[in-house]
Amino acid sequence: MKLLRYGPPGQEKPGILDAAGRIRDLSAHVPDLAGEVLSDAGLARLRAIDPATLPLVSGEPRIGACVGHVGKFIGIGLNYADHAAEAGMPVPKEPVVFGKWTSSICGPNDGIDIPKGSVKTDWEVELGVVIGAKCKDVDEARALDYVAGYCVVNDVSEREWQIERGGQWDKGKGFDTFGPIGPWLVTRDEVPDPQRLDLWLEIDGHRYQNGNTRTMVFTVAQLIAYLSTCMTLQPGDVITTGTPPGVGMGIKPSPVFLKAGQMVRLGIDGLGEQLQSTRHAQ
């Protein structure tokens, strides 16, 4: 299934794409795509509904983040060896974990606000993993059983705040609008191997990132198992799993960063695309 949330910010309704790619309204069946709705049992109930029987959503509504009421938005850094090299950092021996504040979450096509005074706002296309069941101390072999589905994430980052101002990644990762998620939550049954997904990103039509999740340092299963040893993962938590090379700060001979008035387009095979305009934060 391809699940989504549509409507104005803070008023999103749950929906599903039908066979023709049209949005159907799920709000008569579930209040939101959040919490226990994302469990195996909750998704099985949605799967039993014939989308053709649901109300058709007219027009072109705003698409919100594909998960509501996210409890934890967990980032993984330097999870592609070639990205670590372009960043001038060693390949990690254990996952680099940081938090993205949930207030950074926005829809996949909402604008990106460049923070006041920023000259180092950067892009990162990433595979997002949505947890579907409470998860603590799980084995790698069973880790994917706890996944509800997958989505596209742009891990927008302000490099001065991330690296130069005390070295705390959280500070550079959590500005408002720095967490576009979606457009869809694609359930795990439709993604047989999360380590075989092409991902890409363009700025104003120029392709900067081309990668595949097979080159991750730590696989999705390894990340879930690792994180579950130091925290309890809950339904609706989102893990964004790192980016391939091609980010702005790694461009030679001179880094390239986002400016107001640009268009950012990114996507992952089978998971959809995002399109964001950049603007100065007010």
UniProtKB/Swiss-Prot annotation:
<keyword id="KW-0479">Metal-binding</keyword>
<dbReference type="GO" id="GO:0050385">
    <property type="term" value="F:ureidoglycolate lyase activity"/>
</dbReference>
<feature type="binding site">
    <location>
        <position position="155"/>
    </location>
    <ligand>
        <name>Mg(2+)</name>
    </ligand>
</feature>
<feature type="binding site">
    <location>
        <position position="124"/>
    </location>
    <ligand>
        <name>Mg(2+)</name>
    </ligand>
</feature>
<keyword id="KW-0460">Magnesium</keyword>
<dbReference type="GO" id="GO:0019628">
    <property type="term" value="P:urate catabolic process"/>
</dbReference>
<keyword id="KW-0378">Hydrolase</keyword>
<dbReference type="GO" id="GO:0016787">
    <property type="term" value="F:hydrolase activity"/>
</dbReference>
<dbReference type="InterPro" id="IPR036663">
    <property type="entry name" value="Fumarylacetoacetase_C_sf"/>
</dbReference>
<feature type="binding site">
    <location>
        <position position="126"/>
    </location>
    <ligand>
        <name>Mg(2+)</name>
    </ligand>
</feature>
<dbReference type="InterPro" id="IPR011234">
    <property type="entry name" value="Fumarylacetoacetase-like_C"/>
</dbReference>
<dbReference type="InterPro" id="IPR051121">
    <property type="entry name" value="FAH"/>
</dbReference>
<protein>
    <recommendedName>
        <fullName>Putative hydrolase BceJ2315_61450</fullName>
        <ecNumber>3.-.-.-</ecNumber>
    </recommendedName>
</protein>
<dbReference type="GO" id="GO:0046872">
    <property type="term" value="F:metal ion binding"/>
</dbReference>
<dbReference type="Pfam" id="PF01557">
    <property type="entry name" value="FAA_hydrolase"/>
</dbReference>
<comment type="similarity">
    <text>Belongs to the FAH family.</text>
</comment>
